Amino acid sequence: MNILEVQDLCKTYGKGEAAVQALRHATFSVRKGEFIAIIGESGSGKSTLLNVVGALDKATSGKVWIDGQDIFSMPEKKLTVFRRQHIGFIFQSFNLIPELNVEQNITFPLLLDYKRPDQRFVNELLNVLGLTERRHHLPSQLSGGQQQRVAIGRALVTRP
């Protein structure tokens, strides 16, 4: 079963002579449980592809289905909830909330949906990510690598 399907995806920035085509007819699928790597030179469209597939940016044309849902046909409010519940996204700058500790940052997406965190799973994430001893530390008290691991935990806590 495909968890992600991308068909004929195009993204153009700008108009007329200033137009830059960042994505040209990207088509691929990812089966449930499969991992893929997106590689390419700087400026080749990797971030644009992830932003469009992750519903953070709009495509110029094409289709994206996640778990069988056409994300481009969803109303914005539904898409926001869908993205939070089905897509684990790690931003380059991590986007941790400075006032929340490690555990609170990891469980934050669940709280947005009024879901009680599965403490066993949260503890497992903290352990696997090597953050158990830092669970009550604020982001400012962590190294860059530790902050990245918090962002990974936050992306995985909803079990996307």
Feature map (PLM): residue ranges:
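ABC family nucleotide-binding domain
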Residues: 2-160
